[in-house]
A protein has these predicted regions:
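Short pre-active-site segment immediately N-terminal to the catalytic Zn-binding motif
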Residues: 185-188, 283-308
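Short coil-to-beta strand junction motifs in C2/discoidin
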Residues: 57-69, 190-191
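Active-site-proximal segments of metallohydrolase catalytic domains
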Residues: 211-287
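Extended acidic/polar, glycine-enriched regions
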Residues: 100-167
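Fold-level signature of zinc-dependent metallopeptidase catalytic domains
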Residues: 144-203, 216-226
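Catalytic Zn2+-binding segment of zinc metalloproteases
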Residues: 308-324
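Short amphipathic, basic-aromatic surface patches that mediate peripheral association
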Residues: 23-62
Length: 465
């Protein structure tokens, strides 16, 4: 009786205890400056965001070994690792372009982590020869009087698009609108819900919808749409998104990191998707930064899912025939991305457990025929963009391209096999993808087996199963 009573009292006491409050969200904004030969980092500001830390306190350490960059938050007194994450950055992409050979640029970047109780050391590392090398450190004292605790201007009401649980137990996706006027707010909400359904209609997200919360924020724009310099269109949209990033007409990013982070701080999030109020084909995606898509493009469903694959799981582009601004690497090493390989050791293929016995490595496919077809398509595409042809004509070209791709690839002997198919990572030779077709290769509607597994691994980092 005594034991039962004691147990009951303990249980009652536990149930009446308030849940431990989540720590605040601390953000270190910094500048990343350099060119192809050197780089410099400098602190901009340290802020406390308006909302508590949205992550699971039991999942603070990143063991995926993904990203070109990696940061650690260490206790300054003991060196104990408190938090870590891998990520990519706009600077990391820009430095691989021709411009970086003869010019310096500065980009604003941010590191977000649970606010510490005691001083911490921030360690930033960069991947070199597939090892992370320390490139910058700085110290943060949570009692520093210069830490900015002010609240930025509100971007408007937070839209609850899909809530399946508390932020700490789910992967939290924030959908932001850019280029939507106050009168177009209802359009943004409809667009956000439409793309949410598109994402969770695509495996493996479809099977994990319950593991996600989805939120929406849409700061009002003075003018409808975002900038597209190649079309003579310039807008001062709230998030600063623009086509023609690095001179690539379809690549849409924003370099207005401060504005982006201040708006996003009004939602619990780990991942960001920016909907652009435009109909011209375009988008972009950077691992653990954000993804973008032109909401009214006919190909938006494909672009949305493809670019989110980059942002969410660090998936590489598997295509190699479209124009990009990046220069090929001087030295070929094994890519860190989970869905491409240099096949330096065929016996140790990173997805070998998914390869059926008897599948040849490398795996044959009608590459010459495919390359010839794509060469014609890309020549037409460049000509049409140079002539500023109507978007309807571009859509017709893309439909023709997809039809030819499907006819060519669907009937191939290894069309459904996991293997190592040459042509990936923007290179025709020397890099290989896991399956003949995938949404990361063409406008195919789904992910391959390797990409699906990589996505599920990241879901497990943020959602309590």
């Amino acid at each position: 009786m005594k034991t039962k009573l004691g147990l009951s009292v303990c249980l009652l006491f536990a149930l009446t205890l308030p849940a431990l409050a989540a720590p605040a969200t601390m953000r270190l904004d910094y500048y990343h400056t350099g060119d192809v030969s050197h780089e410099v980092f400098s602190v901009d500001r340290v802020v406390i965001e308006p909302l508590p830390w949205p992550g699971d306190p039991a999942k603070t350490i990143d063991r995926t070994n993904l990203g070109n960059y990696f940061f650690e938050v260490q206790d300054a007194a003991t060196g104990r690792l408190l938090y870590s994450r891998g990520f990519n950055s706009i600077y990391g992409e820009w430095v691989t372009t021709e411009e970086a050979k003869h010019a310096h640029r500065t980009f604003s970047e941010s590191l977000r982590f649970p606010a510490p109780e005691a001083p911490v050391k921030i360690v930033l590392k960069e991947r070199e020869n597939n090892q992370f090398k320390e490139v910058w450190t700085t110290n943060v004292d949570p009692k520093d009087k210069f830490i900015d605790t002010s609240r930025p201007p509100s971007p408007g009401p937070l839209v609850n698009i899909q809530k399946n649980g508390e932020p700490a137990t789910k992967a939290d996706l924030l959908i932001l609108g850019d280029g939507y006027t106050a009168a177009e707010r209802a359009k943004f909400e409809n667009d956000a819900r439409r793309f949410t359904d598109i994402l969770f209609g695509t495996p493996p997200f479809r099977e994990h919808r319950q593991d996600f919360n989805v939120w929406g924020l849409c700061p009002a724009a003075e003018e409808s749409g975002v900038s597209r310099p190649s079309g003579g269109v310039h807008r001062r949209s709230p998030l600063g998104a623009s086509y023609d990033t690095f001179g690539t007409e379809r690549y849409v990013l924003t370099v207005e990191n401060r504005a982006l982070r201040d708006v996003a701080s009004y939602a619990p999030y780990e991942f960001i998707e920016i909907l652009l109020n435009n109909n011209t084909y375009g988008g972009g995606g950077i691992f653990n930064l954000y993804a973008t898509v032109a909401a009214d493009s006919e190909w938006a469903p494909y672009v949305f899912v493809h670019e989110f694959g980059h942002h969410f799981a660090g998936l590489a582009d598997e295509y190699y025939t479209s124009d990009v601004a990046y220069l090929p690497p001087e030295k070929r090493t094994e890519p860190w991305e989970p869905n491409v390989t240099a096949l330096l050791d065929p016996a140790d293929l990173k997805w070998k457990d998914l390869v059926a016995p008897g599948t040849p490595i490398p795996t044959p496919w009608p590459k010459e025929q495919f390359d010839a077809m794509e060469k014609q398509i890309q020549e037409q595409r460049r000509k049409m963009r140079a002539e500023n042809r109507p978007e309807a004509e571009m859509n017709a070209l893309f439909k023709e391209e997809r039809k030819k791709e499907e006819e060519m690839l669907a009937s191939d002997k290894y069309a459904k096999s996991v293997g190592a198919f040459e042509g990936a990572n923007y290179e025709s030779k020397g890099y290989y993808r896991p399956q003949e077709n995938c949404i990361m290769f063409t406008r195919y509607p789904s992910f391959c087996e390797v990409c699906r597994r990589a996505i599920e691994r990241i879901i497990g980092m943020y959602a309590s199963q």
